[in-house]
Structure formats: structure tokens, C-alpha cells
């Protein structure tokens, strides 16, 4: 080999190595750009992010629901609701024709006038009702002793707030998510009652403490339920991240606070360790540690699949998979309308075959990453392959809603039960103390349960203040 040939060979080898390094760098940068674009494109419609994280630039509405073919608004046969005209008025004001004013026969005509039309105005009268309790002393004519009456147990001081005012304050602060300072302003201006923020906090905390026994009963009801929903959401408490966990069904709501999101937080709630029914959740890995029957929230899967479709429009499998899930849901609803409790075996077999076929297509469109020579460790597989793995590994739990009609399609029940927690933190930003967060979750557990039993929140609060919180539901 001549010196020139040797030089050209060395240069060629150097170029090959340089191109290989550049190719690896470009591939790594492309992966990083793809990850950043996916993160940038995430919103509440194509991921598990809450709507509050969308900011002012809301994505265009693109519902996953299909058109029902029905016109918008109330449907034929729908029972409407309006302000009733049947209420008995406490005051009647009659209006004579304007031209009769000043007529000498005005009073005579007024006595003969007939009612042409009645219109009613419903308004509220705001007044403070003060009840004075006094003890009486008498001298017994039989014994000669001086006897004195006693105050009711709930009348403890020279002056105090009544139960309706306490109930209103608790309802404002929890159900209404009104801050203590705003409550102080409202009660001062509307009722003329002086309140301090400390008094508001004290009332709410005292009310929560009285619910300890009820919380134990609600927890037992959720544990004994054949199907329960589980979820969690992050909240700031005393400048630290905590987690509000929920375990609920269509009749009871159990909320509790924990410093942990995963298995430790679930153990702290003492629901899942004793639960033996079907647990519906969002596929968070910690739930799979419990030896129960699991149902996966398909609404979460649809949002994730929507995200894949938007970020990787060239891939076909997410569209097919979304269509399959929605078809299963539609078939279930049609079967339930005819009184069935599961889909026919041949339909389930066809669904299973197509499910497996779409999983195979997903792996074909997303091959395993190739290990780079000289680079330590396994190559990073990415979130897309992780989603496909989940759909493959938990197929039985994803399809459970079609095999057992007791199992719902989604985990909306748990998400609805957590919604007021997010509303409260959106208004207040955070909870200053752990006891305050604990108290709020107890109260919302009780009120959420009362709502499911058909009892309005204010009535439920008054029942609890009267010492009868369990009156909200039948034993």
C-alpha cells in the first residue's frame, strides 16, 4: 500500500467514525426533541394533566364522545325545573291602571276591580334571630330549698353563635370554598355579625373533629363495597407536597391525607389492605401490589392514546385501539339496555383477537431500541413502549368492564369526589396546617356521602351539628 493509499484509508476510517458519532448525536437529539414536543403538547385532553394546568390558552374542544344524533338542549319527555308559582305569598300588592290616579271614583272602581294577571317575586329576608336562655330560681314549698334551672348543654357562654350560623359558615368554607377572610367580610356586611378569621377556622375544625366516628363508618362501607374507585391528587400542605387519597363508590366517599402517593399512602388510609372487591383506578403501579380484581380507567387510556395520535400522526395503532375501546363501551351500553350482564362469548372473542392484533401492530410501529455499542446499561424504551406494555400486560383489567357489567368504563366517580379538593386549592392555593387539610377532607367525605344519599350539604351540616350525622343515610 502506497503512502497515499494509506493516508486515504485512514481518512476514510476517521470519516466513518465521525459519521457514526454524528448519527448517534442526531438520534439522541431527535429523541430529546420528541420528548420536549410531547411535553409541550400535553394538556388535559390528551394526558392525565388537570384542566387547571391548561392556562389561558385552552385547547380547542375535541370531545372523545361521538354525536348521539339528538338535538341540543332538553329532550322530549324531560322533566323541567323552574321557580314555582305555587308558593303562598306573604304580601299582595295590587296595581290599578295608571290613568285612574286622581279620579274621584278611584276607590269605588278599586273595590270592583278583578285580577287580570298575577306575577310573583321571590326574595329573601335576612335577619338575625336572637334567643335568650335564662335560668330561673324558685324556693321549693315542700323542702324550703332554693332550686335553680340549668342551661341546655349546647348553651355554654354568655353569648354564642347558633347552629344555623355555624352550619352556614362551615358550608361556605368547605362546599363553597370561600376563604375565612371573605366569610368574615360577607357576614359582617350582610348579617352585621362581627367575625374573626380565627373564629371561622375554629368552627370548621370543631365540626371536623365531630365527624371522627362517621369517618370510620364511611370507611367500612367502602371496604365492604363490591366495586370501589381509588385515586389521588397532590396538594400543598404547610409548604410541602402531600396527597389527598380517595376511596369511594356511588353511595359513600372516603377522603384522607397522606405525605405519600404510592403504597405507603394507600396503607395509611387502611382501605385497600382490607378491600376484597373490584378496585377501579388509573393503572398507577402501586395499586397492583394488592391482590384484588382490578379494573383500569379506560378514559385515562383514551386520553393517552389521543396524545400518541397527536404527537405521532404516522402511527395507526392508537386510532384503532381507541376505536376498539369505544366500540366495547357502545356494545356494553346496548347489551345493558336489553337486560344482559355481560357481552356474548363470540363478541368477547372477536374483541380479544383484535385487541391482540392492535398490540402486535403497536410493537411493529415501535420497535425495541437498539443497544448502542460501548454504551452501558439498557437503552431507554420511552413512554410510548411503556404504554403498549401496560395495554399488553393488563389486558384482562382493561377489558373487565365488557365482561362484567358491574364494572364501569372509567374512574370518573373517584375523579368527581376529588374535584372539590382541587377547587379549594385553586381558591386558597394551599393548606397552612396538616390539621386544616385533614379537617377539610373529613368534612368533604361526609358532605360527599350526604349528597350521594340525596341530602343537601347544608342540611347535612345541621344534622351533624345536632349530633345526628348518620341520619344522612339509612343504617
What is each PLM-predicted segment?
Residues 1-160, 201, 230:
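Short, flexible loop/hinge motifs at secondary-structure junctions
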Residues 6, 13, 27-28, 136-139, ...:
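Catalytic center-proximal scaffold of phosphoryl-transfer enzymes
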